[in-house]
Each structure stands twice: as structure tokens, then as C-alpha cells.
């Protein structure tokens, strides 16, 4: 399990081009999402929140998120998939957190609906998958 997922980390800039900035932490290459990537130079240290996006890429978001490991926050349900759970927008770029059907009521007619707000925190399983955990 990767212990930087879902938390704030500091990593060194190892590569940059016109579109992307990359940092490395503990041998892991991470794409940086920042409004001003041109401000960073090779060798600079960057602090940000690390997660895996929907394209299965490690991403570091330099803007501190409203939720992270151990910190609960509100997110909006954006989709419901009855064989998986509910997808919640928590403000991470390119990633919605899923609250597993295992953590939801047995009866799907009482599940949260699109537009509902949930109080959740991210968790990481032993396969480095991030899930939303209800308060």
C-alpha cells in the first residue's frame, strides 16, 4: 500500500514541459496539477495532495483539498451505480470518490441520490484504490 495516497506530500520536480510538470517521491513519478506550473523549476520542492485520477495516473494537486485522509468534508453525489456504489465529487481534479455499496444501506431505494451531499473522508485499500468512507 502506498502511504502518500490521500495525504499531503512534498516531492522534487524532475521534469517539465509546456503542458505538464512531474515530481518524484520515494521512486514514484507524479503528475502535478497546478494553475501556474511555469512557476516551478527542475529541483524545486512542491507540496501537494496526492491521489490517483480516473486515468489511473498518480496526481499531485497543489491546492489543498477540503477532504483528505482523516479529514471529513462534504461532497456532492454525481452518479449512482447500483453494482458499485455512489460517486461523490469532493473537488479533486479528474477524480470522484466512490462510496462502496458495502458501506451503503442494503435497500437501494434509500441510497443517496444525485445532488445529495455526503460527509466523507478518503480511505485507501491494500490495492491502492481510494474509497469514500461515510462519517
Which stretches of residues belong to each language-model region?
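Short boundary/loop segments of OB/S1/cold-shock single-stranded nucleic-acid-binding domains
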Residues: 1-6, 53-74, 133-135
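Short nucleic-acid-contacting surface segments enriched for D/E, G, S/T with interspersed K/R
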Residues: 6-8, 36-48, 105-121
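Short, charged beta-turn/beta-strand-edge "cap" motif at the junction between a beta-strand
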Residues: 16-18, 50-56, 81, 122-128
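A short macromolecule-binding patch
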Residues: 29-35, 94-103
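N-terminal, Lys/Arg-enriched amphipathic/low-complexity engagement segments
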Residues: 25-55
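Conserved hydrophobic positions within beta-strands
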Residues: 13, 50, 75-77
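Short, solvent-exposed interaction modules
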Residues: 67-95
